[in-house]
């Protein structure tokens, strides 16, 4: 079966990772000690994608937990599903990265990385036919961003033909832990552009707004934010974990979603978003789900899709519903809002339907959009980065770990290039294709709309 190896790095990565395993274990009928207690064959049909069946008929997650300090991992271990994980797969240092990307990427993280790769190798040898890796991490701290991107490039070196997929939590000034987040995020994005195949941008700012505006929570906690993340991650991975009509594996998803290799940053969304207690009073209809799912307020990245255009979209509907109705609704959305979909990729919206809804809901839908509006997120980080970098504020923490200012300049310009690439395809139309070749220089010709 096509297995996926899951890696979680740093405090944020371990917290959303642990929540992800709680949610999907529940969906697959696996109790905290790894025994199957479910009631449907569908739960077991593709269980081997994320779980390894041990000799004692216990199911063990194909998960590797990494951090540069023991704190978060201790709380995962003592949490509800802490005994599910393989004890050898907890790998941690003692020193911490101190929210410093350079420590995670070059000094502290580099010392720990070989022992992580040993465990990665062992997990991959347990697989019949590995399809790829998924990493959960944040871009604002030191370990998830610095060591996370180091792991990506090391794993990529060793498994160059496997898909690399990340769930990356992007920092926001509204929910800020550290003042150097823009530095860490820019240095990380510089790596993600080159080394991953698919990156889901999960934006704390958007999560906060959802909790505050839609769920009416006065003081959202990280627990509330992670609850949204785990719902989204569960939805995004549905077609990998359950048999469905559009049977996606990571590679098929990439083929459908990524028109140009650098533009692989997705905006996830989820519906229904209702406060936790108020769901049961009325069932949602397919039109309502479709409407909600395309709404800017439901996006997990703080970008307004109406400010850009969709290159590609994938959606997953869960629950018992009519395929015909789903197709009709999706077509209706596209024809009503045709200006928001680029016309030079026909049929750029793909729909999967899975019969098993998430716990507590009759139906739900998950949205994955590759929209040019994601440039707003990169612009936001870039502006904050430039404000500090112009004054060389806090740079000594990074140069002290052996980094060079040059690396910052490169990361900054790579991110700005990414923004202008998104802009280029936002403006591109099917007609002007011929003209673009004549007046552009060779470089953009190589990347121009084919």
Curated annotation (Swiss-Prot):
Its cofactor is Mg(2+). Its main location: cytoplasm. GTP binds at residues 11, 69, 138, 142-144, 204, 226. PROSITE patterns: TUBULIN, TUBULIN_B_AUTOREG. It holds the Pfam family Tubulin_C. A motif (MREI motif) lies at residues 1-4. GO terms for cellular component: axon; cell periphery; cytoplasm; dendrite; filopodium; growth cone; intercellular bridge; lamellipodium. Changing residue 262 to C: Brain from homozygous mice shows defects in the guidance of commissural axons and nerves, without evidence of cortical cells migration defects. Residues 422-450 are annotated as: Disordered. It is found in: Cytoplasm, Cytoskeleton; Cell projection, Growth cone; Cell projection, Lamellipodium; Cell projection, Filopodium. GO terms for molecular function: GTP binding; GTPase activity; metal ion binding; netrin receptor binding; peptide binding; structural constituent of cytoskeleton. The modification 5-glutamyl polyglutamate is found at residue 438. The highly acidic C-terminal region may bind cations such as calcium. The MREI motif is common among all beta-tubulin isoforms and may be critical for tubulin autoregulation. Tubulin is the major constituent of microtubules, protein filaments consisting of alpha- and beta-tubulin heterodimers. Microtubules grow by the addition of GTP-tubulin dimers to the microtubule end, where a stabilizing cap forms. Below the cap, alpha-beta tubulin heterodimers are in GDP-bound state, owing to GTPase activity of alpha-tubulin. TUBB3 plays a critical role in proper axon guidance and maintenance. Belongs to the tubulin family. Heterodimer of alpha- and beta-tubulin. A typical microtubule is a hollow water-filled tube with an outer diameter of 25 nm and an inner diameter of 15 nM. Alpha-beta heterodimers associate head-to-tail to form protofilaments running lengthwise along the microtubule wall with the beta-tubulin subunit facing the microtubule plus end conferring a structural polarity. Microtubules usually have 13 protofilaments but different protofilament numbers can be found in some organisms and specialized cells. This is Tubulin beta-3 chain. It comes from Mus musculus. The lineage of its organism: Eukaryota, Metazoa, Chordata, Craniata, Vertebrata. The gene is Tubb3.
């Amino acid at each position: 079966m096509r297995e996926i190896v899951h890696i979680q790095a740093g405090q944020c990565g371990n917290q959303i990772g642990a929540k992800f395993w709680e949610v999907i274990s529940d969906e697959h009928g696996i109790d905290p000690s790894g025994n199957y207690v479910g009631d449907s064959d569908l739960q077991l049909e593709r269980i081997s994608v994320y779980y390894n069946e041990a000799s004692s008929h216990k199911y063990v997650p194909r998960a590797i937990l990494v951090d540069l300090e023991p704190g978060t991992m201790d709380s995962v271990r003592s949490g509800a599903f802490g005994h599910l994980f393989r004890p050898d797969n907890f790998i941690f240092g003692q020193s911490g990265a101190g929210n410093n990307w350079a420590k995670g990427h070059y000094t502290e993280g580099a010392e720990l990385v070989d022992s992580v790769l040993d465990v990665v190798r062992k997990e991959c040898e347990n697989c019949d036919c590995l399809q790829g890796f998924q990493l959960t991490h944040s871009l604002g701290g030191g370990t998830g961003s610095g060591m996370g991107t180091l792991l990506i490039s090391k794993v990529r070196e060793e498994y160059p033909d496997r898909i690399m997929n990340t769930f990356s939590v992007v920092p926001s000034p509204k929910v800020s832990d550290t003042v150097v987040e823009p530095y860490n995020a820019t240095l990380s994005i510089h790596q993600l552009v080159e080394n991953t195949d698919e990156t889901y941008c999960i934006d704390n700012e958007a999560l906060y707004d959802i909790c505050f505006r839609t769920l009416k929570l006065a003081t959202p906690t990280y627990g509330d934010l992670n609850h949204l993340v785990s719902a989204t991650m569960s939805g995004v991975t549905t077609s990998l974990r359950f048999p469905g009509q559009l049977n996606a594996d990571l590679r098929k998803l990439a083929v459908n979603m990524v028109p140009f290799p650098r533009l692989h940053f997705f905006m996830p969304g989820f519906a229904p978003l209702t406060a936790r207690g108020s769901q049961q009073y009325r069932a949602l209809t397919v039109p309502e789900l479709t409407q909600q799912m395309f709404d800017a307020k439901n996006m997990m990245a703080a970008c307004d899709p109406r400010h850009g255009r969709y290159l590609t979209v994938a959606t997953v509907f869960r629950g018992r519903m009519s395929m015909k109705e789903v197709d009709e609704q999706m077509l209706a959305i596209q024809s009503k809002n045709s200006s928001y979909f680029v016309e030079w990729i026909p049929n750029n919206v793909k729909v999967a339907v899975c019969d098993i809804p998430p716990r507590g809901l009759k139906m739900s839908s998950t949205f994955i959009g590759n929209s040019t509006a994601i440039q707003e997120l990169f612009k936001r980080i870039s502006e904050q980065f430039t404000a500090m970098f112009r004054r060389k504020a806090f740079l000594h923490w990074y140069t002290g770990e052996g980094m060079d200012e040059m690396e910052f300049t490169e990361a900054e310009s790579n991110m700005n290039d990414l923004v202008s690439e998104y802009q280029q395809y936002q403006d591109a139309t099917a007609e002007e294709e011929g003209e673009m070749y004549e007046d552009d220089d060779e470089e953009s010709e190589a990347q121009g709309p084919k």
